[in-house]
């Protein structure tokens, strides 16, 4: 028997979300998108546009351009940055996360990250299976964070407009 469905709060105004997904390790990263879309719909985020970029490094520029259009009330980024043995992958990951934070602070459009950087990732079926499951969990978590933040911002902006905050 399934547990009763949870009724999530509804938004006062329609929300439109951009989901920017890196194609590097697509079979892993797309699990976040699939889980996000399902959870987002349950949370009344029904307008989601999906954009693909080659890798995680390309996500911040796309996020910034999308934020500047003012079409989107939120942007979600998903990618996998792994140690390929040549470059210091944590520098790439750090740069991407800082750039995403800069985008949201400059544009006041919230940006959520499901860009993950495991300490170890080996191209074995065991690691692929683990990270597919992990990205599915992160997809749900980022949908929860997105919906809750948008509800909070909607409330806060209403209070600011009313002179309460």
UniProtKB/Swiss-Prot annotation:
Organism: Bradyrhizobium diazoefficiens (strain JCM 10833 / BCRC 13528 / IAM 13628 / NBRC 14792 / USDA 110)
Name of the protein in question: 6,7-dimethyl-8-ribityllumazine synthase 2
Phylogenetic placement of the source organism: Bacteria, Pseudomonadati, Pseudomonadota, Alphaproteobacteria, Hyphomicrobiales
A UniProt-annotated Pfam family: DMRL_synthase
Pathway recorded for this protein: Cofactor biosynthesis; riboflavin biosynthesis; riboflavin from 2-hydroxy-3-oxobutyl phosphate and 5-amino-6-(D-ribitylamino)uracil: step 1/2
Alphabetical list of HAMAP family matching this protein: Lumazine_synth
Enzyme Commission code: 2.5.1.78
Gene coding for it: ribH2
Presence of keyword Ribosomal protein: no
Active-site residues per Swiss-Prot or TrEMBL entry: 88
